[in-house]
A protein has these predicted regions:
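Helical cap/lid subdomain of alpha/beta-hydrolase-fold lipid enzymes
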Residues: 1-187
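Extracellular glycoprotein-like low-complexity segments
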Residues: 183-412
């Protein structure tokens, strides 16, 4: 954002979680948030509180930008933000509106490590918030109601292809032919109000997984699971009317109309904990509904869950940790049910296999795990025999009439 942006928008673009110790130095220097250009510039260039430039794979760490490039950008804006075209040149600006768009970043801990979360606004085109889109001096300003257009015409329209949309093509035609731009259902001279929009659900994951959802008609929004998930570039779909898919680093967000039910799937792409959150998005305000934290995940993990728009807080997740068909149920009580012993051992084996250690040490650790598995299996068979003998004794007591048939069935 430019200096002009901060003059128009009072909301901070960066906030710091008070409970995250790694933000303490930042909070001491800039305060709990950044809402001025001077603070913003010193943060992104690393000149306020000095920090090293992160490696290219460390996307959770804030980048360090070159000071001279930031200065050049600010000077460009200072020169042209107030530029007025000659009177004989017609100037028209159009802002896309109604699609969830990132408006701020909150630095916080994620699974115990430094990370960040994103704050969204509905007042943008999925890339640019509307104050940036109409920051110039113009004769005419219009708003393209993308919320309505995506729901009724083309759900994939966003910032990158605005010029291809029919309503924008009509505006261009009117300008070229020196005609007036006519308002319609999608092109407005007055900005729509976020309070007039229906509520949405946000379902998000922060983890090494890919997330997707199906509506009741089979339309899909999310990362297409039917592709090579190890590829560098993955195919994303937004086929559910009124839906939006967003992603940052390892976090993925699916915005959905709060109506009907949605069947979700996620697949593991690595080892680590997964957090699933369900939130309500109303008039630009996000409210937590349910959270499922630190769910164990491996590359073989898959999970499914159904979100009912009327009762999203009752959602339960069915998890297959290792892809072996052994499932467990996770409820929104802040965490998972306890892992079975077999699931825990499999998770440990997967983790050992990914360790960057000497091969001899790795094989020795795996051998010890294998020995433990055999001992557990032997103990399991012994317990099965004990339970079988107990069952026979109970049946004998039933035959003798000392235990009722109903009680025997219940015990069995």
């Amino acid at each position: 954002p430019s200096p002009r942006y901060f003059d128009k928008v009072s909301d901070p673009v960066i906030t710091f979680d008070l409970d995250a110790s790694f933000t303490e130095a930042w909070r001491n220097f800039w305060g709990p948030s950044i809402n001025t250009y001077a603070k913003f510039s010193s943060f992104v260039t690393g000149t306020g509180v000095v920090r090293p430039k992160p490696g290219e794979m460390f996307l959770q760490d804030p980048e360090v930008l070159r000071t001279e490039l930031m200065d050049d950008a600010a000077n460009l804006h200072n020169t042209y933000d107030d530029y007025q075209f000659p009177a004989h040149i017609r100037t028209v600006q159009v802002a896309g509106w109604g699609v969830p768009t990132v408006k701020a970043i909150k630095y916080k801990k994620s699974h115990g490590f430094p990370g960040y979360d994103t704050n969204f606004t509905i007042e943008g085109d999925k890339t640019v918030v509307y104050p940036s889109a109409i920051s110039s001096v113009a004769d005419e300003t219009y708003f393209f109601d993308l919320e309505k257009y995506r729901k009724n015409e083309d759900n994939n329209t966003q910032h990158r292809d605005l010029l291809n949309a029919g309503p924008i093509q009509n505006i261009l035609t009117s300008i070229i032919e020196k005609e007036n731009v006519v308002e319609n259902n999608f092109i407005l001279t007055t900005k729509p109000q976020a309070t007039n929009l229906n509520d949405q659900l946000i379902v998000s994951t922060n983890s090494p997984v890919i997330l997707g959802a199906y509506d009741q008609l089979g339309n899909f929004t999310g990362i297409d699971p039917n592709q090579n998930l190890s590829a560098d570039i993955l195919n994303i779909k937004e086929d559910i009317p009124g839906s939006t898919f967003m992603y940052t680093n390892e976090s993925q967000y699916i915005f959905l109309p709060k109506e009907g039910s949605y069947n979700f799937i996620y697949k593991g792409t690595g080892n680590g904990p997964t957090t699933v959150e369900i939130e309500n998005f109303s008039a630009d305000v996000t409210t937590p509904v349910a959270s499922y934290t630190d769910i164990p995940t491996t590359p073989n993990t898959s999970a499914t869950f159904t979100v009912e728009s009327t009762t999203p807080e009752d959602t339960v997740i069915t998890l297959d940790l290792n892809g072996n068909g052994e499932e467990e149920i996770i409820s929104a009580d802040g965490g998972s049910t306890e892992l079975s012993l077999n699931q825990l051992i499999t998770l440990i084996k997967e983790k050992i296999s990914t360790l960057v250690i000497k091969d001899k040490l790795k094989q020795n650790l795996l051998k010890q795990i294998s020995s433990l598995e055999k001992k557990i299996e032997n103990k399991k068979q012994k317990n099965i025999k004990i339970l079988a003998n107990l069952g026979k004794k109970i049946s004998n007591q039933e035959i003798k009439g000392k235990i009722s048939t109903a009680d025997t069935v219940e015990i069995a």
